[in-house]
Regions:
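Cysteine-centered catalytic environments shared across enzyme families
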Residues: 1-185, 199
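Short catalytic/ligand-binding loop motif for oxyanion handling, primarily in non-cytosolic enzymes
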Residues: 17-21, 97-98, 136-139, 190-193, ...
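Short hydrophobic alpha-helical segments that form membrane-spanning helices or hydrophobic packing faces
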Residues: 21-25, 140-142, 237, 329-334, ...
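Adenosyl-5′-phosphate
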Residues: 68, 253-462
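Generic recognition of stable, solvent-exposed alpha-helical segments in well-folded globular domains
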Residues: 72, 106, 110, 135, ...
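Glycine- and acidic
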Residues: 95-102, 152-157, 196-200, 310-316, ...
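Conserved adenosine/adenylate-binding substructure
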Residues: 124-127, 190-241, 272-319
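ATP-dependent adenylate-handling ligase core
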Residues: 158-218, 231-255, 285-286, 333-337
Length: 462
């Protein structure tokens, strides 16, 4: 077809931080899928819904809503000469890099230059650096040219935040670098669930509310300031790998769900739908390359992970990250494999620059009580059984509602045991899990669906 006969609508870039959802008939598009939903003519898409349940967020161009899709990376949406929508796959620039080897020295120079440039651009302002003590925020703080410009903020995961490993490491780093460091206490973030669904709708599960509380408190106490994020730096740097993908069912390996999804066996729809056949066939040869699998993992999960900068942006912060820059990302990914694996190249850099914190591991708490305690501090409204039971097993919805009440003594004891040093690895092998957190993870996947169904019912009553 002659390209001149096409009418350009919108195009997605190489990474997809800014989502592009679109109506399959009209071509109307928006970053918020909620803008496109017709509640008076609503129908779930079975394949898209099952994909959402499996991943905990939308994946592979599908959404749970019939007639609404999203553009994947390097795709352009057109009207063809007959006025029909057409998706065109553009060249993928990352493919040119997956067989190359980059220079560590050059990679460090690129990261430093990016951070310095943003700091210089905001030379007369304080800069917010969310600091976990992990590698990415550690590098941002280290490469910031004027330490007095930085205000670092951390939160802890355990019931005693000041003993959390993130907080101890962040405080130590900031003391070494003479950076103003602050701890932000969070825990009431479930009150932001309505705001989350308003901003992200059905694009992902409702599990990022803690960032709304975190940045809201920073904003209230310090006003808005430019922010440098370490978003996805760990994935480019070698923190994880993706096992081989040899069949459609292996495509779930690109999800990195960390348990925040919903078991499709509790869904009443046809669960035998093979949601991933098309995606596997299109990319199976490229997915033989371990680096391309990392790229695909990041591109898949960016549907969710983009909230790491979208939440502060929604609250008024100007955000930047070196780890969203194409050249930096490709340089990090293509470090010599033996140096890239487990981030050895970064570990050696920290040793060389007196930023190694491994000696603090035994002095820190690795408990994660954040979600559990949030259900006590701000109890969740039970899921609407009547609304959800036509799609999901009623008994399981009732089980979720029962076990999100984490103030129950039996659930508190179980959670404490599950986080005890010697039991946390034994219990899962015995089939024992932290019931309240399993319920919480299922809840946050279903809650955006419930909100859509509520709006459908409201429209029906009019």
């Amino acid at each position: 077809m002659n390209s001149k006969s096409r009418e350009f609508i919108v195009s997605q870039d190489w990474l997809g931080v800014n989502k592009i959802f679109f109506n399959q008939k009209t071509g109307q598009y928006s970053e918020n899928v909620g803008d496109l939903i017709d509640y008076s003519n609503f129908e779930f898409d079975s394949e898209g819904l099952l994909t959402y349940l499996d991943f905990g967020y939308c994946a592979f161009g599908k959404t749970p809503i019939k007639g609404i899709s999203f553009l994947e990376q390097n795709q352009t949406l057109y009207f063809d000469e007959d006025g029909q929508l057409e998706i065109v796959n553009n060249d993928d620039p990352s493919i040119n890099y997956i067989e190359t080897i980059s220079s560590e020295e050059n990679t460090w120079e690129q990261i430093e230059s990016n951070i310095r440039s943003f700091c210089d651009k905001n030379i007369n302002k304080n800069l917010c650096v969310p600091t976990s003590g992990g590698f990415d925020s550690r590098l941002i703080n280290f490469f910031s040219p004027r330490k007095e410009q930085i205000k670092a903020f951390s939160y802890g995961l355990s019931s005693n935040p000041e003993k959390s490993f993130e907080v101890i490491k962040a405080k130590n780093i900031c003391e070494k670098l003479n950076i103003d460091w602050n701890i932000v206490e969070i825990g009431h973030f479930n009150k932001f669930i309505t705001q989350w669904i308003e901003d992200f709708n059905i694009s992902s599960h409702a599990h990022g509310m803690y960032h709304y509380e975190f940045y809201t408190k920073i904003k209230e106490q310090n006003n808005i300031m430019p922010l440098i994020s370490g978003i996805i730096g760990d994935l480019w740097a070698g923190s994880t790998s993706v096992s081989e993908i040899s069949s459609p069912k292996d495509m779930i390996n690109l999800g990195l769900t960390r348990g925040i999804n919903f078991d499709r066996k509790f869904c009443l729809l046809n669960k035998k739908i093979d949601s991933y056949e098309k995606e596997f066939e299109e990319k199976k040869d490229l997915l033989k390359n371990s680096r391309y699998r990392i790229i695909s993992l990041i591109r898949t999960k960016i549907m969710l992970l983009s909230y790491l900068i979208k939440v502060p942006i929604n609250l008024g912060f100007e955000c930047s990250s070196p780890f969203l820059d194409f050249n930096i990302c490709m340089s990090m990914l293509t470090i010599e494999p033996s140096r890239w694996e487990n981030r050895k190249w970064q570990r050696d850099f920290f040793m060389k620059n007196n930023l190694d914190l491994s000696h603090l591991n035994k002095k820190s708490s690795y408990r994660n009580d954040l979600d559990f305690n949030s259900m006590i501090l701000h109890p969740l409204d039970p899921l609407n059984v009547n609304l959800l039971s036509p799609i999901f097993k009623e008994s399981y919805i009732e089980w979720i509602n029962k076990n999100i009440v984490s103030s129950r003594l039996d659930l508190r004891v179980l959670h404490w045991l599950m986080n005890t040093k010697y039991l946390r690895s034994i219990f899962p092998k015995l089939g024992i899990n932290d019931k309240s957190l399993v319920a919480y993870n299922s809840y946050v996947v279903l809650k955006p669906l419930e909100e859509i169904l509520k709006r459908v019912k409201q429209v029906e009553k009019k």
